[in-house]
C-alpha cells in the first residue's frame, strides 16, 4: 500500500511541496536549534570555574569531551538506522530520538554537576542517532519515484537546518553567557519540545502511515535475541563501571 502524497494542488501548501515537508522542516530546524545552541555554551560551562557557574574542568579536558561527544553523535546514527529499519519504523524512531534529546537538555538545565553532564551526553548522543538519519530518510519518502520536486524539497529541508543552526548560538549563547548556563540549556530543551509538539501533530495529518512500521522487521526469535544481547551488554557495562569505582579509577581522565 502506498500512502505517499500525490503531486496535486492540494499538497502544494509548503513552497509547492508535500505538506509533510513542513512537519519535517520544523522538526529538524528545532532539533538543530537545540543541538547547536547547547554546543555554543557547553564548552564554556565545562571549563568556567564553579564560582562562575561552570564545572571547573581544565580547558584541555573540556575540549576533549567536546571532540568525543561530536564523534559519538555521528557514530550513533548506525544504531538509529538499524532500529528504524528493523524495530520501530522511522516515524516512531524520530519521535523517541527527539524525546531523548529533550531530556538530555533538561538534564543540563538542572544544576546537578558532572553527573548531569554525562547523563545529558548519553541521552543526546542516543537521541540524535535515532532522529537525524531517519528524519532525512522520511523527507525522501514524501515523494513518489520520478517526482521532480524531490531535489528542491531537500534544498528547503536543508535551509531549515541552517536556520536552526544559525539562530541558536546567538540566542542560547546570549542567555547562557549573559545570565545563567542552565537558562541557556533550558532554552535548548524548549526548542526540542516545540519540535516534538509540531512533529506529533503534523505527523498524524501529513506523514505516511507506512513510516510507522519497520521496512525489514525482525522476526520474533530475532527480537528476543536482540533483547537478550542488549541486556547482557548493558549489565557488562555497568559492572565495568562499578569495578572501576571500587578500584578508584572511575574518573574523567581515564576517558578523555
Pin down the residues of each PLM region:
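Hydrophobic core of transmembrane alpha-helices in multi-pass small-molecule transporters
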Residues: 29, 104, 115-131
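Intracellular loop-helix junctions on the cytosolic face of multi-pass helical membrane proteins
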Residues: 1-17, 145, 173-256
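C-terminal ends and interior cores of transmembrane alpha-helices
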Residues: 96-117
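Intracellular juxtamembrane helix-capping segments at the cytosolic ends
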Residues: 130-145
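Short amphipathic helix-loop junctions that connect adjacent transmembrane helices
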Residues: 40-63, 248, 253-254
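Cytoplasmic membrane-interface "Motif A"-like loop-to-helix N-cap segments
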Residues: 86-98, 146-147
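A gly/Pro-rich, aromatic-decorated transmembrane alpha-helix motif that marks the paired
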Residues: 39-40, 78-79, 162-178
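Central cavity-lining transmembrane alpha-helices of secondary-active solute carriers
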Residues: 63-84, 132, 166-168
Amino acid at each position: 500500500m502506498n500512502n505517499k502524497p500525490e503531486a496535486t494542488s492540494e499538497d502544494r501548501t509548503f513552497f509547492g511541496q508535500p505538506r509533510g515537508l513542513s512537519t519535517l522542516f520544523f522538526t529538524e530546524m528545532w532539533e538543530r536549534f537545540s543541538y547547536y545552541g547547547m554546543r555554543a555554551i557547553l564548552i564554556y560551562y565545562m571549563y568556567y570555574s564553579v564560582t562562575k557557574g561552570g564545572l571547573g574542568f581544565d580547558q584541555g579536558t573540556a575540549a576533549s569531551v567536546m571532540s568525543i561527544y561530536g564523534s559519538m553523535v555521528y557514530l550513533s546514527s548506525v544504531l538509529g538506522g538499524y532500529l528504524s529499519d528493523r524495530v520501530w519504523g522511522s516515524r516512531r524512531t524520530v519521535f523517541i530520538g527527539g524525546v531523548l534529546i529533550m531530556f538530555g537538555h533538561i538534564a543540563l538545565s538542572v544544576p546537578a554537576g558532572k553527573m548531569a553532564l554525562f547523563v545529558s551526553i548519553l541521552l543526546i548522543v542516543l537521541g540524535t542517532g535515532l532522529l537525524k538519519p531517519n528524519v532525512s530518510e522520511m523527507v525522501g519518502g514524501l515523494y513518489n519515484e520520478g517526482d521532480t520536486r524531490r531535489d528542491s524539497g531537500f534544498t528547503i529541508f536543508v535551509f531549515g537546518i541552517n536556520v536552526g543552526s544559525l539562530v541558536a548560538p546567538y540566542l542560547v549563547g546570549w542567555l547562557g553567557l549573559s545570565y545563567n548556563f542552565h537558562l541557556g540549556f533550558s532554552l535548548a530543551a524548549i526548542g526540542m519540545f516545540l519540535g516534538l509538539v509540531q512533529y506529533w501533530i503534523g505527523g498524524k495529518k501529513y506523514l505516511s502511515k507506512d513510516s510507522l512500521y519497520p521496512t525489514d522487521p525482525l522476526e520474533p526469535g530475532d527480537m528476543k535475541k536482540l533483547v537478550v544481547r542488549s541486556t547482557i551488554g548493558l549489565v557488562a557495562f555497568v559492572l565495568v563501571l562499578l569495578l572501576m569505582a571500587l578500584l578508584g579509577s572511575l574518573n574523567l581522565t581515564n576517558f578523555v
